[in-house]
Amino acid sequence: MAVVTVPDKNLVLRDAEEIKNYLAAIGIDYERLESEPRISPDAAPEEILAAYAPEIEKLKATGGYATADVIDIKPETPNLDGMLQKFRPEHWHDEDEVRFIVKGHGRFHIAPKNGDVAAITMEAGDLIRVPRGTHHWFDLCEDRTVRAIRLFQDTAGWTPHYTSSGVEQKYS
């Protein structure tokens, strides 16, 4: 299950309901899907998408998402550090960022316009929706592994708009 940390308040949340409520208050949707995977997290991307098709179709219908894919990041990913340099600076998107973790761990930092930065450490079974325009950044956890289903409203996919604020340097 996710863990939410708010460093400036010295706050750590581990309870699913507290996490959901706290994140909702800063505009982030969080859900915990089944804890037992219905397919191997190492399955082919098309098998993962098929296994989670009911959830994907529901999200597409309610959020206007046009497409889904599977991102697979691991320590041996070619140019991993270069890839992470695109995710780590604070940025925002013209569309929602939706991620469902199927393997590994990742950490989203959310920088609300009128609130404290919150770090959401996610693991398999965690689903997050970061609304369009929300300032945030992402990094891997210690295992440097994450496999996630991503949903997009625009078939062109993930396009960041960097803020150049440097705020991420205080929290990384």
Where are the regions a protein language model picked out?
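Short, surface-exposed beta-strand-loop junctions and turns on beta-sheet-rich folds
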Residues: 114-116, 144-145
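Conserved metal-binding segment of the jelly-roll/cupin
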Residues: 122-142
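Short, conserved beta-strand element in jelly-roll/cupin
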Residues: 92-112
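Structural signal for conserved beta-strand scaffold positions within catalytic alpha/beta enzyme cores
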Residues: 5, 32, 69-72, 150
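Conserved short histidine dyad/triad with adjacent acidic residue
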Residues: 70-94
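Double-stranded beta-helix
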Residues: 139-172
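N-terminal leader/capping segments at the start of a protein or of a new domain
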Residues: 1-65
